[in-house]
């Protein structure tokens, strides 16, 4: 795969237009194609620009395009070889081609990577549901909610701004976030993981010592209010098996609208 930063501007424009046909939350792919973050893009050689694979630095990836079905074997070979893969990859498929035998081919014997099979849930935000439950979401006693700043970029954790943005300046420019804190601890952070047009996908991270207090809910609710005031639509996606994230999304006014194939692929050996 080649770095998105090496692509010609017109190539990125073509890919961005092609992504508009994908009926799924693909902000991570847009972030790479639009040049907001680094990343990798591969195009099937035998079908020109009609079948693509994009990988975000966080590890999320997408196969999409009008010609995926015509070059399915070439795509499978590319994914199974995995020469580009240096960390665990979380692969999503353009819903138009979800019925192709991805699981059968990716998990076939002889591959260089371990493959796990999951489902990813895309949610849709309902402002009426959010407002109906907003009064029940309060900042816990002893905590305060404040806007994120540059120091939050380097926050430790697995779902944190440094995994989604190249630097603190870009993180704050494209959405920033809100954090819950007390005198001793930064308890939770709700932040912009992907920003595209007038939509923003949320990321959430809670400090291990602060879990179970409702901090993530309160931080996310403040961020959603801020987004709505700016005319920005909140977006939420997660693995179906992440029950805490599914429950949090529901509490914040999101409801599931589609469930898609989702594959974990380890680096090749």
Residue ranges and their predicted role:
Residues 8, 23-24, 127-128, 177, ...:
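Long, contiguous binding/interaction regions
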């Amino acid at each position: 795969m080649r770095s998105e930063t090496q692509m010609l501007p017109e190539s990125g424009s073509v890919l961005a237009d092609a992504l508009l046909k994908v009926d799924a939350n693909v902000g991570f792919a847009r972030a790479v194609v639009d040049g907001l973050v680094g990343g990798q893009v591969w195009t099937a050689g035998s079908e020109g620009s009609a079948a693509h694979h994009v990988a975000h630095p966080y590890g999320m990836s997408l196969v999409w395009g009008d010609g995926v079905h015509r070059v399915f074997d070439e795509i499978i070979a590319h994914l199974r070889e995995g020469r580009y893969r240096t960390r665990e990859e979380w692969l999503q498929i353009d819903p138009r081609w979800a019925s192709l035998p991805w699981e059968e081919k990716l998990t076939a014997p002889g591959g260089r990577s371990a493959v796990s099979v999951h489902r990813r849930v895309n949610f849709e935000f309902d402002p009426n549901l959010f407002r109906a439950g907003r009064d029940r979401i309060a900042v816990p006693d002893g905590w305060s909610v404040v806007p994120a700043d540059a120091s939050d970029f380097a926050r430790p954790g697995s779902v944190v701004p440094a995994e989604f943005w190249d630097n603190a300046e870009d993180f704050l420019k494209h959405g920033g976030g809100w954090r819950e804190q007390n005198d001793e601890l930064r308890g939770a952070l709700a932040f912009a993981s992907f920003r595209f047009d007038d939509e923003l996908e949320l990321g959430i991270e809670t400090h291990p010592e602060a879990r179970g207090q409702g901090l993530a809910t309160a931080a996310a609710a403040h961020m959603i209010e801020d987004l709505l005031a700016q005319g920005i639509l909140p977006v939420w996606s997660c693995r179906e098996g992440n029950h805490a994230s599914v429950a949090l999304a529901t509490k914040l006014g999101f409801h599931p609208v589609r469930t898609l194939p989702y594959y974990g692929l380890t680096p090749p050996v």
